[in-house]
């Protein structure tokens, strides 16, 4: 069942499973190893989602060269250049982190928690860039028409779709928790079910 956004597009869905049985021949990994398989799937998804979809630095840099402000071109404004510099540094950091992840995968290693870093940064950065780009356009930023808006309404479209990207594959809050616990080594949340297989939890629930 589709879940529409403010633009009436359906990028999210509710999926219902009733009386589903998966045969053992379709099992991935060893018995009791489902959590590791699930994490591998999630980390690969986060690696893909964190691939800096446009608009990224290149697009906002191009827009700043085309937009004229009261004091001159946007690219010449000190405040604009400061934001561009921040996004450039963040983008390079994400790219290099992705290279590390891809190198590990090429060596047969499991994807690690560092993939959460890229997704956490790019999700917010894309939303911030889209919002800032629309601010630079002034009243043209309110035009959501590919044929008439600057850069074919790329920034307007991104502002509407970016929030969903910050949910898919794990919300910002979940990603920060993973980075804190698995990358920085901070104390984990207290969990009474930690270390207990899901099958055992189900048995206790039925008991």
Describe the residue ranges of each PLM region.
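Short helix/loop capping segments that flank catalytic or ligand/cofactor-binding pockets
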Residues: 1, 24-27, 50
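Short, small-residue-biased leader/transition segments that mark boundaries at the very start
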Residues: 2-7
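Short alpha-helix boundary/capping segments
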Residues: 8-9, 30, 48-52
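A generic structural signal for well-ordered coil/turn residues at beta-strand boundaries
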Residues: 9-16, 31, 36, 161
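Alpha-helical interface subdomain recognition
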Residues: 14, 43-207
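Short Ser/Thr-interspersed hydrophobic loop/turn segments at strand-loop and sheet-helix junctions
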Residues: 18-22, 39-42, 183
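Long, acidic (Asp/Glu-rich), low-complexity accessory segments flanking structured domains
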Residues: 20-34
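Short, exposed interaction patches on small structured surface elements
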Residues: 27, 36-43, 47
